[in-house]
Amino acid sequence: WGAIAACFAVIAVLGVGVFQNGLFGNKTDIATLDNGNEIIFVKSETAGSSIDIDGTITTRQLTETEAASLFPNLTVTAHAVFRVDDTVSDSNKELIGFEGKIENAKVVISTTDIALLDTKIVGSEESSEVNGTSVTAGYFVTDRNSVGEQNVIYYATFKLGDSTVYVENAGAKTESESVKNDLATIIQELINNGALDLSSFNG
């Protein structure tokens, strides 16, 4: 990873009005959690977008101890993402988020008002409640490839304290139930864990 000039794609107004313009169809897919809560995934369309972040971005991989402390009861491999102002030393870098994997699912967490994502979701908003936390979720199906196969991608965004979380799980369309339910379990576990404790996190 190293220090690189930042160019991340973002969700438009991450976590607030993420899905706009009514481009979703009426299709929904529901995951029922073991506590009875439901996550409603609404069929969507997607579009890419990118934005430059002022300053320089540097990253480093979380240690096993850090990952276990930040994400208890989950198997996580992730990098911490820092912004370094060109006018200050690297020792004054600012933590702005995390990017990595929980099990096979992608996770991107913004710990400031800077959104770090490589997907922009366009559609119509519908939120669910998981243990009192609002979750906005959707899914989309890819075009058929040369042999007629399609993939499905389920995703969701929600707040944990001051952090905004985006999670995404993908797989073959024929395995959509497993893809959906695996992501729903991860969402529930993240919400059960509560806000990230960054008080002892070292750059």
Explain the meaning of each model-derived region.
Residues 27-30, 36-39, 48, 54, ...:
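Intrinsically disordered, low-complexity regions
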Residues 4-13, 32, 48, 68-69, ...:
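Intrinsic disorder/low-complexity segments
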Residues 9, 90, 163-166:
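Amphipathic alpha-helical interaction segments
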